[in-house]
Amino acid sequence: MPTAEPARKPLMSGNWKMHHNHLEAIQVVQKLSYALNAADYDAVDVSVHPPFTDLRSIQTVLDADRIPISLGAQHCHWEDKGAFTGEVAPTMLAKLAVAYVIVGHSERRELFAETDDWVNRKVKAVLNARMTPIMCVGETLPEREAGQAEAKVDGQLRAGLAGLAAAQVSGMVVAYEPIWAIGTGQTATPDDAQAMCAAVRAVVADLYDRGTADATRIQYGGSVKPGNAADLMAQDDIDGALVGGASLDPDEFARIVRYRLTE
């Protein structure tokens, strides 16, 4: 008798980047919570990833009001302590009840020269601190036009997951973000996004096994908006969205979280 594939609960993550001070952040989270209900949280996991300076304020609000939104961070170092001016340790984030940490976002790779090796170290550090990494992969427009999109993502995945056990990978999140679509208003078509997310799952299956690949959640990111969320989420291998600009507005982000109501 065939075994049903494990259900992958969608994860909608709002990456606020360098936006919202702590007072604005409190208002956004409260407004977002007013727009969502128990049925939404049953259907979808939700995380918000504010700047470091907002984390404590948001954690206090989430705890006090018992809001079932997970707290996330945008970045961390791989060491627990040391002479790393300006950096934040994963263990420090864990003490603030951070659940998810974005690792290897293209802006970190491009603007701050983060390498695949650094990404791998951070993924391991986040896991060791008992948080869930959201590891980002994606290609540039020239790489896509040259037919190298899958090869680029393949390399990032193999390097980023190096040394990890299957059980660790099955519990983490991979976010496929075509770099050319981030903040540009351009979006990969649902078919293109599905093809790349399926390719991500195939690499995980090749590195580990089909069960691990089927359990791993894969997000799509890149100009996700209320108008395209449902079409993207209808794809077999897309298990959520890593949302940038649209997550800054609580009403817009709520509409994305509630994509199933617009299908």
Labelled PLM ranges:
Residues M1-E263:
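Active-site loop-to-helix "anion-binding N-cap" substructures in soluble metabolic enzymes
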